[in-house]
């Protein structure tokens, strides 16, 4: 009961500041397209190869369950998702689907924003990405104080912007026995997105919207399941997004509420496609 009450409190707090919106455009209580003109200015300084898309993060990003599966199968994908995929497929630098994985590309397990801060200059020099998705925080919950987390994240984002790289920020998923703390770190990311005028993928809010009472795969109600094969949005460890076999690469509404990686892949694809359109990097669709 205590866990349910905590989850409801977090959800109500988020709902109070989030307007009704679809998963792919959830950006908190921010004006529509608040980031478009600032990011156009950033992109005007970009000098690298178009279509390069870096993904800076921890184990939730380095895994081949994230991003790469979109290239191969999209069962039950809604029309707007297939349109977004076709646009992205025609634009994305091919190695960014699968090969930009590992520490030298800015994603590795067990890492925090401290690691990103220490290495961001090298990543930007090596990759010079047109757009970068950034999601750190899950490991920071038990090792990096919130004030330091926010300070270092702002520095990482600023370094990207200064180099001409457009940033997409992502909130982190809720976490077993650390729900309130994960919510606070996600709020910090929303504040950074607002202040620095960068687009946001609010993974945390979408998980709570879809599964307000039972997002946590570590809950006893899911004791019969193992590992990532849990039909809710977090795996049995209560840390990573779930990836149950029956919902892998499935983008039906049922799957988006039952497979954490399907939900994240959908949200990132749609936001990346929106950024491409709003920055006039791809032809307008009629």
Where are these regions (language model features)?
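Stable alpha-helical elements in mature extracytoplasmic
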Residues: 31, 35-38, 116, 120, ...
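Conserved SGNH/GDSL esterase-like catalytic core that processes O-acyl groups on lipids
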Residues: 28, 45-150, 223, 249
